[in-house]
A protein has these predicted regions:
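Positively charged n-region of N-terminal signal peptides that target proteins for export
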Residues: 1-4
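Hydrophobic pocket/interface hotspot
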Residues: 57, 68-69
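A short hydrophobic beta-strand element
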Residues: 128-146
Length: 189
């Protein structure tokens, strides 16, 4: 009887230690995988897709008439104090903030959570293929105060600092949709 009890205890002890060892290994592997995936997403997929989609919209917007712009983004051309352009302004501005309570100065400042949210908005609301043509903006740094008297095309809106966006330490006029004449000529297709 004593032998049976001792053998049972030995078997239970062995299974307990083996079980814990397996759990521990599995847990650490999962943790490593999650970290690797997060790093990969942050440095590649979402950030590049967001940038590509934004620049695609920038190019399309700059080459279309006001009515064509409205047709491209009907959900965001709303009636309001400043007309359709104000609606599109809010739409594009959303790419950079993704949440009115979470302000960012650069696409690179986004966490994975907000990057994923932006990608969802791009695909869902704009129906934009995030892997198509990309516009490279001129690598020029300037402050919004230089353009306080400039007006948007097809609009009576007089821009203020609210309508300028800082991307990677550089200021772009008009939410990236409208660059001043000197800089816009440097946009590369």
């Amino acid at each position: 009887m004593k032998r049976l009890i001792i053998i049972s205890l030995v078997i239970v002890t062995i299974f307990t230690f083996v079980g814990c060892g397996t759990e521990s290994n599995s847990s650490s592997k999962t943790s490593t995988t999650v970290t690797t995936t997060a790093d990969s997403v942050k440095s590649n997929k979402y950030y590049n897709d967001i940038d590509s989609a934004i620049q695609t919209i920038v190019k399309a917007y700059k080459t279309k008439s006001f009515n064509e712009r409205a047709a491209m983004y009907p959900d965001y051309f709303i009636k309001g104090e400043y007309g359709g352009n104000a609606g599109l302004k809010e739409a594009i501005k959303g790419f950079y903030t993704c949440d009115t309570e979470y302000k960012i100065n650069s696409i690179k400042d986004m966490t994975d959570k907000y990057a994923k949210k932006c990608i969802k908005e791009i695909k869902g609301y704009y129906d934009v293929d995030v892997n198509i043509e990309k516009v490279v903006l001129a690598n020029v740094s300037y402050k919004y105060t230089n353009y306080s008297d400039k007006r948007l095309d097809d609009s009576e809106l007089v821009p203020t600092d609210e309508y300028y966006i800082c991307i990677d330490g550089k200021w772009y006029y008009g939410w990236g949709l409208e660059i001043n004449s000197e800089v816009s000529e440097q946009v590369v297709e």
